Amino acid sequence: MRSARLVLAGILGASLLTGVSVGSASATSAPTLASCKTAIASQEISSGKLTVATDNPVYTPWFVNNKPSNGQGYESAFVYALANILGVAKTNVAWAYEPFDSSYTPGHKSFDFDINEISDTPDRAKVVTFSDSYYDVNQSIIALKGNKIVTMHSAADLKGYQFGDQIGTTGLTYINQYIKPTKPARVYSTLDQAVAALQSKQIDAIVVDTPTGQYMASSQIVDAKNNPLATQVGQFPSVGEHYSLLFQKGNALAACVNVGIAALKANGTLAAITKKWLGIYTSVPTLQP
């Protein structure tokens, strides 16, 4: 759904990376973990430094306490694991701010990559470069406990309700393409605005990725005594959506990042991070199409 970023800090800036070969490999050779470590440690790509950006605020379970640099939360932990396997020290990873809805616009990017629950979609891929998937996504419905929508369990049952969501998100796309409500979904500039509309009963429900939805229902939408006011109605079957790191179009670093992601999957690190930070979300019931 959203985004974060790493800014190149070497002699070659992010704007100069397009078309650069990785390490000693030629432009037609597939990079290896060893060649990528060499390329990143040298001045060929980033002189061993990466600057990462994400939105503000960021949410549990992707980040914790709105502090991307603490290594807590799925996306923060993943970034540092990725940096480590590519030979970048934790102290050489810097974080910066990038609004979600501007991350996937065309043009120069002042970061290495952006991580903020950004879904790899065909339209976005026309103007930016995406990494391989680091998380496969299900969308789910969040509603206030007293709303009748909480008893609905299929897309057909949901059509008569008022949905709302943040502009540019795949949650909003899911509402329009799969739920197809009879009332046009209301669109908000930020997710916080959509949540406020839900709390004030201007809308009946929001569609977000399952982990974000679980956090909203259990910890974000609460009363003065922190009792949950909302519930996660259920999650939809997968439609092939996944989250990827976002790069400036043609950024050569993406090839090395893909090598790193593959290595984290192969050695079990990504699975361990998933179990630690997202394990409880596998039990959310699935809604019928």
Where does each model-flagged region fall?
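Alpha-to-beta junction loops
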Residues: 88, 108-118, 161-162, 200-212, ...
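Periplasmic-binding protein-like
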Residues: 136-143, 218-259, 280-289
